[in-house]
């Protein structure tokens, strides 16, 4: 089962509001989903994106793939940058630990 983090459209006609959900890739756009991770209001101004960052990171660690639109929203919210920095720091720390033992 391929799991994606994607948008689910809600709201009135011509006034969209999107939920950011985790869903099976074969499920319909507005159909079944596994979990709601947040919401996005395109006409919302500054607080247009509201996310549960811990749950987003959990699903990314499990292997869920964000769609292109959700990836750009995660980038705007700063979640992907924080995730990248944490992974880079862990990789550098592992390399620093492995380097001295290899020289000695």
Curated annotation (Swiss-Prot):
Q: Which InterPro entries match?
A: Ribosomal_bS16 (IPR000307), Ribosomal_bS16_dom_sf (IPR023803)
Pfam families the UniProt entry points to: Ribosomal_S16 (PF00886)
GO CC, sorted alphabetically, is: cytoplasm; small ribosomal subunit
Coiled-coil annotated residue ranges, if any: none
Keywords linked to the UniProt accession:
Ribonucleoprotein, Ribosomal protein
The GO terms describing molecular function are: structural constituent of ribosome
GO BP, one annotated term: translation
Q: Point out the signal peptide segment.
A: none
UniProt family annotation: Belongs to the bacterial ribosomal protein bS16 family.
Q: What is this protein called?
A: Small ribosomal subunit protein bS16
Gene transcribed to yield this protein: rpsP
């Amino acid at each position: 089962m391929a799991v994606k983090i994607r948008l689910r459209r809600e709201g009135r006609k011509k006034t969209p509001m999107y939920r950011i959900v985790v869903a099976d890739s074969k499920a319909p756009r507005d159909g079944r989903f596994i979990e709601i991770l947040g919401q996005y209001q395109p006409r919302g101004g500054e607080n247009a994106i509201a996310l549960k960052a811990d749950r987003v990171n959990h699903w990314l660690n499990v292997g869920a793939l964000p769609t292109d639109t959700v990836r750009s929203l995660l980038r705007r919210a700063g979640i992907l940058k924080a995730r990248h920095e944490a992974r880079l720091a862990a990789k550098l720390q592992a390399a620093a630990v492995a380097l001295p033992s290899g020289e000695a």
